[in-house]
Structure formats: structure tokens, C-alpha cells
Amino acid sequence: MSEEMIERHQGDEMIRLTLMDGQVRVMMCETTQMAQRAADIHGATPVCTAAMGRLMTATSMLGVMMKGANESVTVNVHGDGPMGTIVAVANHGDVKVCADDARVELPLRADGKLDVGGAIGHTGRMTVIKDLGLKEPYVGTIELVSGELGIDFAQYFTVSEQQPSLVSLGVLVNGDVVLKAGGLLVQPMPGCEEETIEQLELRSPMFADISREMTEAPKEQLLEDWFRGMKPVVLDRTPLRYHCGCSRARMEKALISLGRKELQTIIDEDTGAELGCHFCHQQYQFTTEELRQLLEKATRE
């Protein structure tokens, strides 16, 4: 029996599917538009765009795995490279990112590729924080393996979630333009047959350079080609977007959380306050009078 064609969709989205009657779980996503949005917001250089794009892609996969409406995942990557700390936050379809320094410039690697590992650093740690709406979040931390992020996320899944995984992440950039961004996650489920794992290992070179592959064919065609004969079945598709979600109300809460003493100090300086969002660079101004009202509110609470 011939395998069905996967319906073609345009734009950023996550496709979840199974192979070999559920023996293998696969997630593939296109994240071109949100990588471009991140580059524009942060004025990022090509290598920083690639780093942030890869991190958003992998974090969006973790986000789509979350079940609850108010659940979210935050991934902090703290390497010894010049970008400093990079943070991505995702829920079921929305993702945002920021970095200490998104304007780092580095020479290309010897193979002509962007030096993402050099920008992030080869030594450091990656921390995954899952807010499941419980009292305490789930926190998993690993040491960075390469800083290129694909192998680092594979290590995270294997060590922290006891789930052997193949992760491919890619962002193809030309100057200020993101040509293609996306990622693939392949996870053999418990009880997966050895023959199936061998098939995946044989095919893995085909999706090693995923962003370049995605410039040459639709993501759906790539899935059909890569997993032909392995009974791919699409489970669901989730639109993805860069979305911050900051608001004046949230900034008010942030000011109140400083505490009465700190708020009073700001009021005494009588210059008001300006808070900026790290993820979208929106600025929020508060007058001294507005700060007094927040102080009263903090005192009541």
C-alpha cells in the first residue's frame, strides 16, 4: 500500500508524526518567520540570528509537548562565548528569545558555516525549566557538549529525560535575511525494534543540514523522502509564531515585586521609571505619581 502524501502548508509550524506504527516519534518544524522576527527585534548579526533561531526551534518543540494551556518552558544557555546568556521561552505555539549580546561578529568556520558554537561557547551549561502549574517547576541542567545546540539538546533529552534522541537544527542566513530555519527531532520509543533504529541511523545523514534541505523542497516532501517505507502518520500540526506577551500590567507587577523600600527609593529620586522588555524591546514609562499608586498597592498587599 502506498503512503499518503502529507498536505502542504506555508509558514512556521510544527508537524508531529509517528513512524513504524508508533515505534518512533518525530517532530519537524519550520521557524523561518520567527527567526527573522528575532533578528529584526534584536538587530542581530548572522551568527547570533543562527544561534537564537536554533534555540527557539528546539524550545518550541519542548513547548508543543506541554499539555496545559498555562504551561511553559524556559531554556537558558549560558556558555563562555561572547553572546553571554541566551534565553528562549515557549508555550504551545508561541516563542520568544533574548541574548546578552546579539551583535557579536565572528569569522566563518573552516567549513564555511556560521560559528554558532564560537558565539555561544563550547563550555557552559544549558538549563531547561518547565512550568507545569505546580508549586515547583521541573528543572533539568546539562553541561554544554559543543554549543552548536543540536547535539546539546540531544544530550539533554538523553540525560535529563532518559529519551535517546536525534536533533537537527538549522538557520540559513544571507546578510540580514533568514532564508530558512527549522528543526527535526527523532525519538525511538521504548520497545522500538533494532531494525527500525538501524534504518534511522542509515537515514540520519539526509537531515544533517536541515535548513539547506528546506530551501530545496517543502518540509512535507522532505518528511516523505526521509521516512519513505517507514509508515509516517501525521498526528497534528501546530502553528508557531514569535510572540512576546509582555504588557503594562506585567511591568507593574515587576515594579511591585521590587518591594516597598526599593519603590520608595525610585519615588524619592522623582524621575519616574522606565522598564524595557528584553524579548521585544517595548519600553514602558511610569511617572512618579504612578509609582506612588503602585507603592500604595504594594503596601495594601
Predicted regions and their residues:
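Interaction interfaces in information-processing and related assembly proteins
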Residues: 2-236
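Cys/His-clustered metal-coordination modules, chiefly Zn-binding fingers
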Residues: 205-301
